[in-house]
């Protein structure tokens, strides 16, 4: 029994709130503009985890009123054929967002494929033009997971201005764009990674600690500053002795919640927010094509999760 327990940052409930807001917008816009937003998720091959993720995204689209135009393509597809499919979707007026589900089979280099997606349909925020807009603090499509983290912090009234934020991980999917978003929000940002020396001393300096390492329970309670906000982006599938699997984060959750002030669970923290921001990006892209520039989300303060 711990004497103190951190407030749980409930990404699942917040994601549901975002979905409701987006669904209201979509109903209004469909009546005005005569069509619904469209998202195309491209899955290549038969990776089981990818199948689960794509199914979750398509189900979320259905709840909000976004049409799905995705495709499941064979693992043997050539780069030329996949580029042709992306070009087709770029030109399809029904499609407002395109997402290439990663990872790809080994013979496919994701970079030219991601770069082939039109920047205005790049709902994953990975095109160089959108990353450049992020660097320049200009409007553009933002990477879904980092954007979800920022929405989660805002919804719980966690002010990042002037606070020390450490991001553990430097991937183009999470670490780098999140560091830029925190910097844009006037946090004092440090990035740690696999080559960083004395990782524990770096993480203990953080008032806001974000982990995106892909190493189950790597961050232990003694690596966390008392009272820190801990955001666990890691999703690690661990096989149990009974043959079933569990999802673990990068943080030792039960121990860390006795030290932190706020913490995200795994699952139910950042994961649902990633999907919610994918929906947001799709609707945002759809709105831009109709010259509608108003914010889509109005986040109310989230109560502490039970």
Curated annotation (Swiss-Prot):
GO terms for molecular function: methenyltetrahydrofolate cyclohydrolase activity; methylenetetrahydrofolate dehydrogenase (NADP+) activity. The keyword Membrane does not apply. Keywords: Amino-acid biosynthesis, Histidine biosynthesis, Hydrolase, Methionine biosynthesis, Multifunctional enzyme, NADP, One-carbon metabolism, Oxidoreductase, Purine biosynthesis. It catalyses: (6R)-5,10-methylene-5,6,7,8-tetrahydrofolate + NADP(+) = (6R)-5,10-methenyltetrahydrofolate + NADPH; (6R)-5,10-methenyltetrahydrofolate + H2O = (6R)-10-formyltetrahydrofolate + H(+). NADP(+) binds at residues 169-171, 194, 235. One of its GO terms (biological process) is methionine biosynthetic process. GO terms for cellular component: cytosol. Gene3D superfamilies: Leucine Dehydrogenase, chain A, domain 1 (3.40.50.10860), NAD(P)-binding Rossmann-like Domain (3.40.50.720). It comes from the Bacteria. Pathway: One-carbon metabolism; tetrahydrofolate interconversion. Its EC number is 1.5.1.5, 3.5.4.9. Homodimer. NCBIfam families: PRK14186.1 (NF010783). Belongs to the tetrahydrofolate dehydrogenase/cyclohydrolase family. Catalyzes the oxidation of 5,10-methylenetetrahydrofolate to 5,10-methenyltetrahydrofolate and then the hydrolysis of 5,10-methenyltetrahydrofolate to 10-formyltetrahydrofolate. This is Bifunctional protein FolD. The lineage of its organism: Bacteria, Bacillati, Cyanobacteriota, Cyanophyceae, Acaryochloridales. The gene is folD.
């Amino acid at each position: 029994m711990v004497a103190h327990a951190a407030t749980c940052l409930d990404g699942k409930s917040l994601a549901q709130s975002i979905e409701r807001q987006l669904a209201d917008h979509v109903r209004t816009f469909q009546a005005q503009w005569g069509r619904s937003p469209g998202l195309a998720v491209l899955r290549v091959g038969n990776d089981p985890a990818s199948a689960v993720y794509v199914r979750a995204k398509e189900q979320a689209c259905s709840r909000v009123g976004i049409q799905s135009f995705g495709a499941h393509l064979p693992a043997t597809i050539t780069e030329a054929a996949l580029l042709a499919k992306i070009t087709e979707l770029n030109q399809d007026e029904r499609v407002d967002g395109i997402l290439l589900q990663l990872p790809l089979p080994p013979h496919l280099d994701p970079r030219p494929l991601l770069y082939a997606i039109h920047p205005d349909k790049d709902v994953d925020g990975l095109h160089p033009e959108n990353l450049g807009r992020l660097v320049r603090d200009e409007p553009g499509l933002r990477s879904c997971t980092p954007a979800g983290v920022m929405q989660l912090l805002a919804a719980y009234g966690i002010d990042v201005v002037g606070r020390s934020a450490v991001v553990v991980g430097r991937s183009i999917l999470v670490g780098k764009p999140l560091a830029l978003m925190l910097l844009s929000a006037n946090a004092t940002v440090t990035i740690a990674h696999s080559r960083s020396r004395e990782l524990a001393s770096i993480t203990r300096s953080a008032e806001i600690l974000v982990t995106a390492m892909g190493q189950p329970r790597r961050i232990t309670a003694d690596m966390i500053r008392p009272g820190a906000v801990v955001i666990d982006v890691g999703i690690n599938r661990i096989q149990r002795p009974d043959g079933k699997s569990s999802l673990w984060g990068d943080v030792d959750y039960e121990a860390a919640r006795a030290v932190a002030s706020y913490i995200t669970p795994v699952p139910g923290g950042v994961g649902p927010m990633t999907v919610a921001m994918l929906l947001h990006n799709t609707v945002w892209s759809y709105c831009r094509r109709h010259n509608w520039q108003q914010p889509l989300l109005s986040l109310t303060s989230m109560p502490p999760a039970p």
